[in-house]
Structures are given as C-alpha cells and as structure tokens.
C-alpha cells in the first residue's frame, strides 16, 4: 500500500511537470496487472467517457527492446487491454452493454499509436521536449535513479532520432 501511494505521488509530480491537469488512477495492484476483462472494461468506460480521437499505448507484444531491457509484464498487460478497449470494445453497443445502460455511448477511436515496436511507421522528433521528458521521469525516484535518467534517455533517443521525418533541432 505504501508503494502504491508513493507511486501515485510520483505520477502526480511527473504530470505536473508535463502540465497534465487531471489524472485517473484505476488502482490495480502494482506488479499483478493482467489483460483482464475488468481492466478492458475500465478502459472502455474511460474511452466512452472522454471520447478521444487518439489513444497511445505500449506494444502488447514487446517483451524485449533490442538488447536494452525486458519490458515489464504490467506494461504489456496494460497495452493489450488498451488495444482491446479501442477495438472492439469502445466502438460497439454489443460489448459491455451495462456501460451503454449507464450512459456510456460507444465511441470509435480514430487513431491508435503503439510505441515500442520494431515495426514503427511513425517517428516524432522529441529534441525540443527532451529536457521536460527527463524532468518528468526524474519524479519517479522509486523506480529510476533521477541522476541517471538524462543519460539513459539520451542514449535511448539518439540512435532513433535520425528516423524522425522532422528535422532535428
């Protein structure tokens, strides 16, 4: 419980750095997330509630990122549930009819961006926002060494930066 409270505080601090004004915590246990029907339903409800044009999530199939690191099982589970919430769940009246009865009308997401895939077809130049990304990640001190974040983010981003269709700054 203490770790969960700490992680929420860290996330709120990171979101403040990024200018994110509202955060919704679903409060599933850390380290135990599964791509369950309950999680998919929660995400479907949020999609129907907020009606986003775009959803961005991780790669549900991404176990390894090159030789860099092993992807956390919670991240894979969240990504799978997010993809399944986008399609087919959020856009149809046939799934989660109780959400429909509660006033959550189906909503079709127009774009789904999946990051962390070896088959990427979109690259975005993050040069202009790298410092703020690093500062936001530094807020997660229980998960990463704040003094090392800048180094490993730069090492991670630099080889990918040439793939961006934008000019580098």
Where are these regions (language model features)?
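Metal-dependent de-N-acetylase/amidase catalytic core
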Residues: 36-169
């Amino acid at each position: 419980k203490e770790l969960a409270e700490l992680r929420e505080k860290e996330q709120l601090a990171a979101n403040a750095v990024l200018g994110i004004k509202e955060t919704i915590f679903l409060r599933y246990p850390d380290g135990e997330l599964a791509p369950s029907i309950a999680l998919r339903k929660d995400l479907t409800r949020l999609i129907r509630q907020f009606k986003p044009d775009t959803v961005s999530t991780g790669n549900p199939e991404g176990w390894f990122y090159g030789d860099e690191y092993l992807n956390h099982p919670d991240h894979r589970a969240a990504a799978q549930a997010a993809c399944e919430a986008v399609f087919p769940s959020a856009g149809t009246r046939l799934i989660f009819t109780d959400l429909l009865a509660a006033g959550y009308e189906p909503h079709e997401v127009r774009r789904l961006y999946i990051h962390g895939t070896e088959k990427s077809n979109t690259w975005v130049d993050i040069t202009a926002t790298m410092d703020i990304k690093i500062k936001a990640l530094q807020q997660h001190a229980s998960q990463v060494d704040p003094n090392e974040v800048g180094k490993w983010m730069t090492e991670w981003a630099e080889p990918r930066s040439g793939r961006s269709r934008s000019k580098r700054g």
